[in-house]
């Protein structure tokens, strides 16, 4: 089939999976960016940014009904077909700051978790080994081309050389929780020996410059003196 070219693309739909507990979601994406999803537990629409909810609205009951219908149909199809349960994949996590880090300046840490399947996961933030809940936001499960998922968790924070952070990932595909560590990279202060060496090198370069400059001046004076001697008549 030929790909359809368009200036903008909106995508909405449900994802349901047979697994212990409720696994399913209803999402809406526009040009590849998530606008909202329906929270199954709270039964409410969760907007990716508060401003999106001011532009339009969505009744979460519509999404919940579609998820319920999808689960019902999935159960029927499962009973009528021979199927092999999908294996649990081990997710991969990466932590990085949203902006260049400056101590004392507000910033956001991003924990990007990829290769998630099935879409059931716990992502938590730790600061100095203690759980952090304030300033935390995460997306719904976003679909990859291979039908696995990825998810992003955000933590707003103020960088300090006293704090270290970890993104903790728990998933059925992992034998134990994975911690992805992050701390601000602060240049180490120079030791006294290093400072002495740097000063000595700077002094040496300066002396060499003075000597070379003096030589050029002397040569210039000699050349000038020679040119002033009168030639033969």
UniProtKB/Swiss-Prot annotation:
SMART domains: IGc1 (SM00407), MHC_II_alpha (SM00920). It is a single-pass type I membrane protein. Residues 1-88 are annotated as: Alpha-1. GO terms for molecular function: peptide antigen binding. Residues 91-183 form the Ig-like C1-type domain. The keyword Lipid biosynthesis does not apply. Residues 89-182 are annotated as: Alpha-2. Residues 1-195 are extracellular. This is H-2 class II histocompatibility antigen, A-F alpha chain. Keywords: Adaptive immunity, Disulfide bond, Glycoprotein, Immunity, Membrane, MHC II, Transmembrane, Transmembrane helix. Residues 222-233 are cytoplasmic. GO terms for cellular component: external side of plasma membrane; lysosome; MHC class II protein complex; plasma membrane. The keyword Cell cycle does not apply. It is found in: Membrane. Glycans are attached at residue 122.
């Amino acid at each position: 089939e030929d790909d359809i070219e368009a200036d903008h693309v909106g995508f909405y739909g449900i994802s349901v999976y047979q697994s212990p507990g409720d696994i399913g979601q209803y999402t809406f994406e526009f040009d590849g960016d998530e606008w909202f999803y329906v929270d199954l537990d709270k039964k409410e629409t969760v907007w990716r940014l508060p401003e999106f909810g001011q532009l339009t609205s969505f009744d979460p009951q519509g999404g919940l009904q579609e998820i319920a219908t999808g689960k019902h149909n999935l159960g029927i199809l499962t009973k009528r077909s021979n199927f092999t349960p999908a294996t649990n994949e081990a997710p991969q996590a990466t932590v990085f700051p949203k902006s260049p880090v400056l101590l004392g300046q507000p910033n956001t840490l991003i924990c990007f978790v990829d290769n998630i399947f099935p879409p059931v996961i716990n992502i938590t933030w730790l600061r100095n080994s203690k759980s952090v809940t304030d300033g935390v936001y995460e997306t719904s499960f976003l679909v990859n081309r291979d039908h696995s998922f990825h998810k992003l968790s955000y933590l707003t924070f103020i960088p300090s050389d006293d704090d270290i952070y970890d993104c903790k990932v728990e998933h059925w595909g992992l034998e134990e929780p994975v911690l992805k560590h992050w701390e601000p990279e602060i240049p180490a202060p120079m030791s006294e020996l290093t400072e002495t060496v740097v000063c000595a090198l700077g002094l040496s370069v300066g002396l060499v410059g003075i000597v070379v400059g003096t030589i050029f001046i002397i040569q210039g004076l000699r050349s000038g003196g020679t040119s002033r001697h009168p030639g033969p008549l």
